[in-house]
Amino acid sequence: MLQAVAPSHLAPLGAPPGPRAVVVLGAGKIGRTIARMLHGTGDYAVTVVDRDAPQLAGMPAGIAVRQADPTAAGACIALLDGAWAVLNALPFHAATAVATAAAELGVHYFDLTEDVAATHAIRQLAPGARSVLMPQCGLAPGFIGVVGHDLARRFLRDGGELLSLRMRVGALPRYPSNALKYNLTWSTEGLINEYCNPCEAIVGGRRVEVPALEGLESFALDGIEYEAFNTSGGLGTLPETLAGRARDVDYKSIRYPGHCAAMKLLLDDLRLRERRDWLRDIFDSAIPQTEQDVVVIFATATGRTRAGQGPLVQASFSARIGGTETDAGHVNAIQLTTAAGICTALDLVATGVLPQSGFVRQEAMPLDAFLANRFGRQYTCHPLEETAA
């Protein structure tokens, strides 16, 4: 169930009291969920921008709407002028342009991108920035980086040794019924990006790139069988943060068994990797969307808490998160978790927990502060049990 998001009556840092003006770019399912979450607190004055008028219909009273194309040349500057923060829920290819406008205006910037190149470009804007630039604020990348860093810190804080850190996340249909055993619950473009682009990892203490769809493994959680394989972008900036401090770090997407083989047929044998536009059209026309989904999160770290001493120790985090009903209707699991991630990042900047300018990594958020946050507590769920598949 969606936990109530109570007002906190934020005390603005160096600004007069009152709701902070935030702009949400993109009125898709996740953008609308973000807007409703923030508006419900009373601490944020929310404006939602989308180029399509039908997407803006039905917003709750009190949320301002504006029909405009934020990707049009020069439009973003006008849309963000006077805002305290912008939350970018547009496709990944819009990230750099929006972040550039935000940095120019001194507006705090948050996004959901999984695109590694976009994140690198945004980081180049950070030197001398007057505002926060914080990409990758969703589920993966996003929350999983917060979890991974917390697990790693348990071993490294007292001079210990981190041997492996495995992070696994899946946004899955509850009732798979096709050969892919998959339904669309989020951005098709983002999904294809994850399946086609190189994946960052740490192997043998060295930062490397590994191919997507490789590294297939099988396991079970709470008696349900899954597979997991390399996908791009899920680690965010964690490989850089843990470089030279961990032996092996990787991220894989969780799917039902058989999905990886089917995707290799499409991408490699049929060469749709070379025609991503075709693949997007096929997915959008042939794979049903679903509101009946579940998010599965599983992360495990192994090492020694004191350098060269003591027994080998394992620490884990796991959760299964479903959708929920709200006054505005059903919110599915991927919408809930993604929106909660970016809203928590915004809140932690607003309350001074995070830095107030420059590039901010996801792992800068302490896990306990994240889960205690009024938005972040959506992630507090019953842990899962792993068994060999």
What label would you give each PLM region?
Residues L2-L10, R154-A389:
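C-terminal catalytic/substrate-binding lobe primarily of soluble NAD(P)-dependent oxidoreductases
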Residues V22-G26:
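Conserved N-terminal Rossmann-fold NAD(P)-binding element of oxidoreductases
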Residues G31-R32:
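N-terminal Rossmann-fold NAD(P) dinucleotide-binding loop
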Residues D52-Q55, V116:
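Helix N-cap at the beta1-alpha1 junction of Rossmann-like dinucleotide-binding domains, i.e.
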Residues P60-A72:
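Rossmann-fold cofactor-recognition segment
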Residues P70-G82:
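Conserved Rossmann-fold cofactor-binding substructure of NAD(P)-dependent oxidoreductases
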Residues G74, A85-A102, V116-A118:
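Beta-loop-alpha module in the N-terminal Rossmann-like domain of NAD(P)-dependent dehydrogenases
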Residues L112-P135:
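Rossmann-fold NAD(P)-binding glycine/threonine-rich loop
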